[in-house]
Amino acid sequence: DFDLTYFPLKHLGYKCVVGTVGELYASLARPCSISVRLGISAKLDLPQISELWNGICSAASEHNITKADLDLIPSRNGLAISIVITGISSAKFSENRKSAQSKDLVCISGNVGAAFLGMSLLEREKRKFEKAGDVTGQPDLEKYRMLVGAYLKPELNPDIVGQFSDSSITPSYGYLVNRGLGDAVRRLHRDSGLGVKLYTDKIPFEGNSFEVGKILDIDPISAAMNGGDDFRLLYVIPLSQYETFRHDFQTFSIIGHIAKPDVGSVLVTPEGAE
C-alpha cells in the first residue's frame, strides 16, 4: 500500500524494485531480469507514469538488472504495480550451506524501525495538512530526513551476494525484513525448527529514533519488531565464522543467536527478561 499524497512516484518505483530484489538477495541470488505490469487509471498522466518508470529503471540499473519488460493495462481507479524479478544463484551456496546450529549468529544488515517511524511522521503531517487546509505550506522534515528516507526510498547493497561469494561464509538462512523483525524471526523459527533469541540492546536504530518515538508515542522497539518496510537482510551465520564475518561484513549487526527448539522465538531485555 502507498499514499500518493506524500509518496513521490519516482521513489515508489524505486522502492518496489528494491523490495523485490531483496527477496533474491536473502536467498543469495543475483537479479538479472525484471517484468513490470502497471495498472493505470485516468487519474495518472504521461509525465507521472514516466516518473514512476524512471524510478523503476533507476533501481534496476543500480542492481545490475539488464533486461526489462513493461506492460500497461487499464485500471478503474488508482494505480496497481506488479513486479517480477528473476535471478540466478551460484551452486557454490547450495553446496556450502549447512544446517543451523544452536548458538549460530543472527545478523542484520542495518537499522530497523526507522521506516515505520518515518511513515508515521508523514501520516502526522498529512493529518495536519488536511485539518489546516493549507495548500501552500510544506512541512519541515529535514531533521527527520533519515527516518523519512528509510520509508520513501530504502536501499540495499547490490554487492551483497558478491560479498558472500568472495567470502568463505554461507548463511544457513536468509530473509528480507519487510514486515517487521518479529515476522522474520518467526519465519526463521518455523523454517529451522530451532529457537531464536534476540537482544533488544543489540538491535540497531537510526540516531533519533527514540526522540521521535517519544514525540509520536511509539516505542521504537515495537516499531522494529512489528513495523514494516525496513528492507533489511537477516542472515544466520555459523558461530565458527564469527571473526571472519566481523571483518568482512562490518555494516552488519549481530542481534541474537539460534537456540534450542524449546526456547521458541523470544526477545531478551538488558535485564535478562524474556
Question: PLM features: residue spans?
Answer:
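Helix-biased detector of long, well-ordered alpha-helical tracts
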Residues: 1-274
